[in-house]
A protein has these predicted regions:
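Conserved small/polar residues in nucleotide/adenosyl-binding loops
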Residues: 203-205
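Active-site beta-loop-alpha junctions of metal-dependent nucleic acid enzymes
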Residues: 60, 79-103
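An active-site-proximal beta-strand-loop segment
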Residues: 35-76, 83
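Mobile genetic element proteins and their domesticated derivatives, centered on retroelements
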Residues: 1, 33, 49, 67, ...
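Basic, flexible linker segments flanking DNA-binding modules
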Residues: 1-41, 141, 196-200
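RNase H-like two-metal-ion nuclease catalytic core shared by retroviral integrases
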Residues: 20, 112-114, 120-121, 136-156, ...
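K/E-rich alpha-helical interaction surfaces of small helical-bundle regulatory domains
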Residues: 173-193
Length: 205
């Protein structure tokens, strides 16, 4: 069905949203983005967050940490782990920064919520070292990072809710496949019916 761009949406009662907020444990950055997610070029506004998945009947969870480019909605980098550690988010960030130029870094804003990952010095110092502007949502305000929240909602409706996975290895493989498909094949109305990768390639020919 994905190849034909036809999707069957699966509905399920949603569990409580994962929150990485632990109070003020480090630097809280101002809300520079302020719900203006308009980016005139790629690598100007990156959005990030962490979401969790739990297979029915299992206590263990896995955590997904992606970076989304506000310009075309592409997932630039992501990591998956069985624990919501600093390594989860820091590795994702390091992998993303390898893909852009020094000039891009100086014009980049990275926006997140106030989760402990993003308040921690390992995150904020990495941004400062690369001359990247840090932006944070107001506490408990998901609309301040709505494109990222929307991506999580779409992902879970289209590949997770209502699907039975035998184990977490299978689920991780399906998340990998979904993000590959989302970037390269899933069309977006606001991108003139193109996928994020196709839109970017045609705009920059």
């Amino acid at each position: 069905m994905r190849e034909e761009k036809i999707l069957c949406t699966k509905f399920k009662t949603r569990s409580r949203k994962y929150s990485s907020y632990k109070g003020q444990v480090g630097k809280v950055a101002p809300n520079v983005v302020d719900r203006d997610f308009t980016a005139t070029k790629p690598n100007r506004i990156w959005l990030t967050d962490v979401t969790e998945f739990r297979i029915k009947g299992q206590e263990e969870k896995i955590y997904l940490s992606p970076i989304l480019d506000a310009y075309n909605g592409e997932i630039i980098s992501y990591t998956i782990s069985r624990h919501p550690t600093l390594e989860l988010t820091n590795t994702m960030l390091e992998n993303a920064l390898k893909k852009i130029t020094e000039a891009d870094k100086e014009e980049l804003i990275i926006h997140s919520d106030q989760g402990f990952h993003y308040q921690h010095s390992s995150w904020s110092c990495k941004l400062e070292e690369n001359k990247i502007i840090q932006s944070m949502s107001r506490k408990g305000n998901c609309l301040d990072n709505s494109p990222m929240e929307n991506f999580f909602g779409i992902l879970k409706q289209e590949m997770f809710y209502g699907v039975e996975f035998k184990d977490y290895e299978e689920l991780i493989k399906e998340i990998d496949k979904y993000i590959e498909w989302y970037n390269n094949d899933r069309i977006k109305t606001k991108l003139n019916g193109m996928s994020p990768v196709l839109f970017l390639s045609l705009i920059h020919i």
